[in-house]
Amino acid sequence: MEDKKLSSAKPATSSKPAPKAPSTGTKVVTKPASGPRPAFKPGQRKPHASNASNDKVAFEKRNFTSGDKTKKPTDSKNPRFQRNNKDRKFVSEYEEKIVDIARVTKVVKGGRRFSFSAFVVIGNKKGTVGYGHGKANEVPDAIKKAIKDAHNNLVEVPITKGTVPHEVTAKFLASKVLLKSAPKGKGLIASSRVRAVVELAGYTDIVSKTYGSRSAQNVVKSVVKALLNLRTAKQIAEVRDKDVKDLL
């Protein structure tokens, strides 16, 4: 009986874990379960469910559609929407002439500093003229500033058959200018600085005379001042409350 009890008893198990087998350095990769292939191509980012509505809106904007209504595409003739808009140059109706360029020297503690000043006259040859002044360290920058300043100083002057309506005189500081009307075909009899103003203003026949200082800025400003003092026959008739025929 004792032998049977000993044979039927289970062997005692040790509490120590079994030793692990030495690793060979290879990793075991488990293959995913076989199933249907994804709808997107390999290497393509999987679309997120929350972005489905955004993708639809982007697709509608790209095709210029919004629901059932169709929007017209952007006007291709408009230069603002052209691809070569950066290369397109802005063409202004005003012509410009450089009257004077001067180099300015400023003496400072470290030495001398040089800069440039430009004086420019612009006009559209249709009764609008103006002048501007600009300063910069380089000549092109000074000219650009002068042109920009001239656009802010535009004035309108009267033109009667290509000449001034009547004789006029104006003075600015030490410069004085006389402008007279001339018959058709006479041309512009004026100095270079006076010619720059009257030609860009749109006059074709004028006789002028300059007195006193020949400074470029003073002469140009005196010419513009003289042109602003001009009055047409219609303007004078309105002031006197008469007809134009009575004045003539």
From Swiss-Prot:
Query: Which ranges carry the S5 DRBM domain?
Result: 94-157
List the molecular function annotations (GO) for this entry: rRNA binding; structural constituent of ribosome
> What cellular-component terms does GO give this entry?
small ribosomal subunit
Stretches of Basic and acidic residues bias are at: 57-87
Superkingdom per UniProt: Bacteria
> By its UniProt entry, which PROSITE patterns does this protein fall under?
RIBOSOMAL_S5, S5_DSRBD
Q: Name one GO biological process term.
A: translation
- Stretches of Low complexity bias are at 8-23
Sorted alphabetically, which keywords does the UniProt record give? Ribonucleoprotein, Ribosomal protein, RNA-binding, rRNA-binding
Name the InterPro entries on file: Ribosomal_Su5_D2-typ_SF (IPR020568), Ribosomal_uS5 (IPR000851), Ribosomal_uS5_bac-type (IPR005712), Ribosomal_uS5_C (IPR005324), Ribosomal_uS5_N (IPR013810), Ribosomal_uS5_N_CS (IPR018192), Ribsml_uS5_D2-typ_fold_subgr (IPR014721)
Q: Where is this region: Disordered?
A: 1-87
Q: How does it assemble?
A: Part of the 30S ribosomal subunit. Contacts proteins S4 and S8.
- UniProt function note: With S4 and S12 plays an important role in translational accuracy. Located at the back of the 30S subunit body where it stabilizes the conformation of the head with respect to the body.
* Entry similarity comment: Belongs to the universal ribosomal protein uS5 family.
Q: What is known of its domains?
A: The N-terminal domain interacts with the head of the 30S subunit; the C-terminal domain interacts with the body and contacts protein S4. The interaction surface between S4 and S5 is involved in control of translational fidelity.
What name does the UniProt record give this protein?
Small ribosomal subunit protein uS5
* Organism name: Mycoplasmopsis synoviae (strain 53)
